[in-house]
Amino acid sequence: MYAIVVYDVGERRVAKVCKYLRTVLQWMQNSVFEGELTGAQIERVKSRLATLIDPEEDAILIYLVSDEKWVRREAMGIEKNFRSNLL
């Protein structure tokens, strides 16, 4: 499953959330990560993120799509992490 994670997290917790997400997904731009995950991995990510945030102050959205080909991405302005198929 293809996952897109976006977050708005308090200053004291943002570095921990970002550092963790970098271990499981690809950084796209500020507060946005995406990548392919299995169902079990998605559950682990959700569980870990729940320990890192304050649910009274922070917000995380996880968009799940069955396949990346169904995601249509349009960028405006500079792309902070340009993805390329070149090796």
Predicted regions located by residue number:
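Short, intrinsically disordered low-complexity segments
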Residues: 30-59, 64
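Short leucine-rich amphipathic alpha-helices used at interfaces
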Residues: 1, 13, 19-20, 45-46, ...
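Alpha-helix boundary/interfacial micro-motifs
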Residues: 19, 25-27, 42, 47-48, ...
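C-terminal structural segments of small proteins and small subunits
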Residues: 51-87
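Extended, hydrophobic alpha-helical segments
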Residues: 1-41
